Design a protein with these regions (language model features):
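Membrane-penetrating hydrophobic segments
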Residues: 1-6
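Hydrophobic ligand-binding cavity/cleft-lining segments
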Residues: 10, 17-103, 107, 115, ...
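Beta-strand/loop substructures that line and gate deep hydrophobic ligand-binding cavities in soluble
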Residues: 34-35, 138-217, 223-225
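Short, surface-exposed coil-to-beta transition loops
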Residues: 51-53, 112-114, 167-173
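A short, structured loop/turn motif at beta-sheet edges
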Residues: 59-63, 118-126, 175-185, 224-231
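Surface loops and adjacent helix of pleckstrin homology
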Residues: 70, 132, 189
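Mid-length scaffold segments of soluble, non-membrane domains
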Residues: 87, 94-97, 107-131, 136-140
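Short, hydrophobic/aromatic-rich segments at coil-to-beta transitions
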Residues: 102, 121-129, 153-159
Length: 265
């Protein structure tokens, strides 16, 4: 009897947990209108077998969000997600001027061996990344090479990369839509096409889809936190001094240092 009761309690708990997880997966950030609308980069994967579209409202204008998008990538500012999975260190908490240049054809790295190819760059509006079988295969072999620079999660992904079918393509779009009150709606869309998938890929496919959502959700929350704080941080007022009282070094007046905004946490 005790075993039966314990089993019932465990089963009920697991069922509730799974139910809540599935509901979170299906509803977080989901808007039917956004899911149906066309976004930049949709044409890169015209016949997807899977689409994930999620949105989040940010209390900051698009120009405050854009710099955080441009500097993303492994070895750069990171992905603002679960860093132990996709970064060697933590994601940046400041806007880095040296990572603010991004052009079509550049690679936004996901590991030391490569990453997504940049396909669309519309400053303040849209960023679209892309990969396909050709890109993945050129990096898959290197993913197996042991390296202290590759987190365990990335190294383990080499097995999955080897199972990518021939007809594979994926696009990852970030769209910024201005809202009233100086706010922004960030919409992310991940589209994937998988051809004649092998047995391994068919098994892990659903888990990959859930994994993409989990990382995306954390990333969007991280982007929101960073953009909001940098947008509302008040400027540091420069001291009012006369020329005769301005601090000097070697006879030259010292100008006030520029402000650096740091995200707490």
């Amino acid at each position: 009897m005790r075993i039966a009761i314990a089993g019932t309690v465990i089963g009920t708990t697991v069922g509730i947990t799974v139910g809540r997880t599935v509901r979170w997966w299906r509803t977080w950030g989901y808007d039917p209108g956004e899911a149906a609308k066309a976004l930049p980069g949709d044409d890169l994967v015209p016949t997807p077998k899977g689409i994930i579209t999620r949105g989040i409202t940010i209390d900051a204008p698009p120009e405050a969000v854009w710099p955080w998008l441009v500097q993303m990538g492994y070895g750069r500012a990171g992905w603002y997600s679960y860093d132990r999975m996709d970064m060697q260190g933590g994601s940046a908490k400041t806007i880095v001027p040296g990572w603010q240049t991004l052009a079509i054809g550049d690679v936004m790295p996901v590991s030391p061996d490569g990453g997504f190819v940049v396909k669309v760059v519309e400053p303040g509006r849209a960023l679209v990344l892309f990969t396909d079988t050709e890109v993945v295969e050129s990096q898959a072999a290197r993913a197996f090479e042991p390296s202290s620079d590759i987190p365990a999660g990335l190294a383990a992904s080499g097995t999955i990369l080897r199972q990518i079918p021939e007809d594979f393509a994926a696009s990852w779009a970030f769209a910024l839509e201005p809202l009233d009150g100086g706010r922004t709606r960030l919409i992310e869309r991940f589209r994937i096409r998988v051809g004649s998938a092998g047995a391994t890929f068919r098994v892990v496919g659903p888990f990959i889809g859930f994994g993409v959502f989990v990382m995306m959700q954390r990333q969007m929350v991280g982007l929101r936190a960073r953009a909001v704080l940098t947008a509302v941080a008040p400027p540091v007022p420069a001291p009012i001094v006369t020329e005769s009282h301005r601090p000097k070094s070697n006879g030259r007046a010292i100008e006030p240092a520029a402000q650096t905004v740091v995200v707490a946490g």
